[in-house]
Design a protein with these regions (language model features):
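Membrane-interface extramembranous regions
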Residues: 1-120
Length: 120
């Protein structure tokens, strides 16, 4: 889970830093905030005690869902005045990792929650 959150964070920071997304009004600061959130979630999923790990994984799942939804909205109708194109840099890897974070994170959180209930 940490790797997925970290990868999403890295993609957003790279787009912000190397591809000029920092200059897009409203979207630029959100990309930097998104990168920071991914780092926090990656660290949290590694250092939280076992009883809270399902919460961290659920956070990674929500993070993946939110970033995936944002990119899809920006592709289809635009988001905050910005419309993404299908030729955008890192678009395919971003969609793949965000979808994986959502699906794997949700499954891992449910499994961890179930396992915690069995041990209680």
């Amino acid at each position: 889970m940490a790797a997925l959150a970290g990868t999403i964070a890295g993609i957003h920071f790279d787009l912000w830093d190397s591809y000029g997304y920092r200059h897009i009004p409203h979207i630029g600061p959100l990309f930097l905030l998104d990168a920071a959130a991914g780092v926090v979630l990656a660290v949290a999923s590694l250092v939280l005690p076992a009883r809270f790990v399902a919460l961290a994984w659920l956070g990674v799942s929500g993070y993946g869902a939110a970033t995936l939804a944002a990119v899809l909205v920006s592709l289809w109708s635009g988001l905050l005045g910005f419309s993404e194109t299908t030729s955008a840099p890192l678009l395919a890897p971003a969609i793949a990792v965000e979808a994986a974070a959502f699906l794997i994170g949700a499954g891992a959180a449910l499994r961890a929650r179930h396992r915690t209930r069995l041990l209680s």
